[in-house]
């Protein structure tokens, strides 16, 4: 399966400056070229500073082997360490892929029933923020997306803080 077009943005500059674009398959480009002018615009198109930042960012990603390190070191280690949270009484499931992780908060591990109306995710999110950990709550699922350049020691700290915040959340929920 291959897309005909793909929009891209934040990753081009790692969010340092606004930039976006569209990657289009050759077959689509041929159709557009046969049709004459293709008048369009992007909010962040054609800016020379953004283009320079994007090129430099892509160079850094390539030359410093950041994506290779993510694939072989950071992502496998992050996923391994996140899975260690599965034994926590508040955790129904830990899932993830690459540098993304999700921790489902449940009332009962066996049935995976939720803390209905309790806002467990938002309670946990606040404990995370209070303890220097940025995790997003999507309902009662905690989402983590650390930077690509995170070290093993920083992943260890992330998981330690996540466990602390899970403990605090469990206590706040009366567990």
Over which residues does each language-model region extend?
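Conserved N-terminal phosphate-binding loop of PLP-dependent enzymes in the Aspartate aminotransferase
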Residues: 1-175
